């Protein structure tokens, strides 16, 4: 009771404004049936990684639904379940493409990855971090001006791009194929409900976030990222893949497939250091698609697009320039000296509205499924008032057809599971049926030990549903997130005190990412001292498989130290190899 009072007081220090920043993070409506029966249900959030398929058939089915949803919407042949976030998913594509270079490319050390300057800024920064230790050079620029050469092995582009623009990349992917280069597309999954999927115009890999499928922003996470590709890449794809098999009685059954790619088996030869990644959030996203079905998703996407079109038309009539030509939910606006960014921002903050302010003086905004007609009127009043004009009244607006030359013609979500459970009762029963096929800590102890074996108390998880924690965008001004910052400061102080270290990073999104961040810090330290040659990592043979996989990603050479049958380090072997 005292704790809940305390945490609510902290939550109250966060300010929940109407936020239109976008950049891969969106306000969502989480269906109550999913929030109550999955997100807040220990039958789902305390289950262990499904290494033992016999006690995980429910979650495996939900994750298979996730893969099917991603494959359908992207137009690809294969998807995993799942990854940590969109930026690291793009980095995983970079690693995969680099490993898949042909013999001639390896021989001439083709090591250049082109990255569109219209990708999200966090994706570009992450690619810069991940590329350096493994010898990949980034070429960042305008995709329409790229001159292909034999040093470029791959490319990363955004669809729709950071300004909301929908580009026709058919010529781009054709040129890439002629150059024997791979193309990764970072795509907004909701836009693909209406938009021609990348799989139909030549993409080799499609990545992105499933956050806007019913998972709150949470000041930046956690959310499940998706990764979709073609069959030819199946032995190089990162992360878990759920496959359909047959049990000992000859009945259909689900299991994790192609595990020989993964760190717990391949270790330093693994395709990635990723283990199970945000499976609970992937399950929530899959259930969002199951609950709404293809027609429901089309209504949601259509509403988002129509509201954006209507807003753009009205802003143009006020004298602003909408610079984005074809768009789904995001527009970039030229102010045309009608007002300054400073004035607009001042008036927006007074009205508790967050927009995205560009370095050249433009303003961008992104519409989402929570945006109502009242919200559109508030935005129009904001822009009109800043220009000294009257926005006038706003009439009900009908659905506006999507751009014909970019419209999707292929069907989505045809499978029975996406066309059966559209009432709360039906959905609740389906979720419960799957839950009953699983073993979680609300049933019994699970006799498997690993980094994920912990029980989050109900009182710890309840605050996650509070709007003051759930509905904050990661790029809002810091004075709107004082509650979060207080928690960060207190947690950082406690961790420093308990570990004896001087500082701590809360950024890593998983244990595997934490060890990678640590190894990258060690690497940076040696480089700062001119000791870049110190690149050997001694790792016990009994260490978790992510350890050697992360060391390789950090550009290190792995030397394995022997262990006894109980996993204890052989000290004599350690001394010999450390000498």
Predicted regions, residues:
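Conserved PLP-enzyme active-site core in the AAT-like
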Residues: 88-253, 315, 332-333, 346, ...
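Gly-rich Lys/Arg/Thr-decorated short loops/hinges at beta-loop-alpha junctions or inter-strand turns
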Residues: 41-53, 71-76, 107-110, 138, ...
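Conserved phosphate/anionic-ligand binding catalytic regions in large, soluble enzymes, centered on
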Residues: 215-228, 232-233, 277-281, 371, ...
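Conserved catalytic alpha/beta cores of large enzymes that bind or transform nucleotide phosphates
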Residues: 252-254, 258-264, 268-289, 296, ...
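Active-site C-terminal subdomain of aminotransferase-like
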Residues: 213-314, 318, 323-325
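N-terminal entrance/gating region of PLP-dependent enzymes' catalytic architecture
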Residues: 1-65, 71, 265-266, 404-490
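Short loop-beta-helix segment that forms the pyridoxal 5′-phosphate
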Residues: 18, 51-55, 72-91, 495-518
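Conserved PLP-binding catalytic core of the aspartate aminotransferase-like
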Residues: 305, 318-348, 367-370
């Amino acid at each position: 009771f005292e704790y809940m009072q305390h945490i609510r007081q902290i939550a109250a220090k966060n300010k929940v404004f109407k936020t239109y920043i976008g950049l891969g993070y969106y306000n969502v409506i989480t269906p109550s049936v999913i929030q109550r029966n999955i997100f807040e249900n220990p039958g789902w959030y305390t289950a262990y990684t499904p290494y033992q398929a016999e006690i995980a058939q429910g979650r495996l089915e939900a994750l298979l639904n996730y893969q099917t949803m991603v494959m359908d919407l992207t137009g690809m042949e294969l998807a995993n379940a799942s990854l940590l976030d969109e930026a690291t998913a793009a980095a995983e594509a970079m690693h995969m493409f680099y490993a898949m270079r042909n013999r001639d490319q390896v021989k001439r050390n083709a090591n250049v990855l082109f990255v569109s300057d219209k990708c999200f800024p966090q994706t570009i920064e992450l690619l810069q971090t991940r590329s350096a230790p493994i010898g990949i050079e980034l070429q960042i620029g305008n995709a329409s001006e790229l001159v292909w050469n034999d040093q470029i092995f791959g490319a990363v582009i955004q669809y729709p791009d950071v300004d909301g623009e929908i580009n026709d990349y058919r010529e781009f992917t054709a040129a890439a194929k002629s150059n024997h280069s791979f193309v990764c597309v970072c795509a907004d999954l909701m836009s693909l409900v209406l938009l021609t999927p990348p799989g139909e115009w030549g993409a080799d890999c499609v990545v992105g976030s499933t956050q806007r499928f019913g998972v709150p922003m949470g000041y930046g996470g956690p959310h499940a990222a998706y990764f979709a590709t073609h069959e030819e890449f199946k032995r190089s794809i990162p992360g878990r893949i759920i496959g359909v098999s047959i049990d000992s009685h000859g009945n259909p059954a689900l299991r994790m497939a192609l595990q020989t790619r993964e760190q717990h088996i391949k270790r330093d030869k693994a395709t990635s250091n990723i283990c199970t990644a945000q499976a609970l959030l992937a399950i929530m996203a899959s259930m969002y698609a199951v609950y709404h079905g293809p027609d429901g998703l089309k209504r949601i996407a259509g509403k988002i697009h129509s509201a954006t079109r209507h807003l753009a038309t009205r802003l143009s009539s006020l004298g602003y320039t909408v610079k984005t030509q074809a768009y789904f939910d995001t527009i970039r606006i030229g102010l045309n000296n009608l007002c300054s960014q400073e004035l607009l921002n001042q008036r927006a903050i007074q009205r508790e509205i967050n927009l995205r302010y560009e370095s050249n003086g433009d303003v961008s905004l992104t519409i989402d499924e929570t945006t109502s007609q009242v919200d559109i009127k508030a935005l129009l009043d904001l822009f009109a008032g800043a220009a000294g004009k009257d926005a006038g009244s706003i009439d009900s607006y009908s659905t506006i057809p999507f751009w014909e030359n970019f419209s999707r013609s292929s069907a989505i979500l045809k499978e029975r599971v996406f066309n059966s459970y559209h009432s709360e009762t039906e959905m609740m029963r389906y979720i419960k049926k799957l839950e009953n096929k699983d073993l979680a800590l609300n049933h019994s102890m699970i006799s498997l030990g690993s980094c994920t074996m912990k029980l989050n108390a109900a009182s710890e998880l309840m605050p996650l549903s509070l709007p003051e924690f759930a509905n904050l965008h990661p790029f809002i001004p810091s004075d709107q997130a004082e509650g979060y910052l207080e928690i960060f400061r207190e947690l950082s102080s406690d961790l420093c005190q308990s570990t004896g270290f001087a500082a701590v990073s809360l950024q890593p999104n998983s244990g595997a990412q934490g060890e990678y961040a640590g190894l990258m810090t060690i690497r940076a330290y040696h480089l700062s001292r001119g000791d870049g040659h110190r690149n050997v990592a001694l790792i016990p043979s009994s260490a978790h498989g992510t350890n050697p996989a992360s060391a390789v990603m950090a550009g290190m050479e792995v030397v394995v130290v022997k262990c006894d049958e109980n996993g204890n380090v052989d000290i004599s072997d350690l001394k010999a190899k450390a000498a």
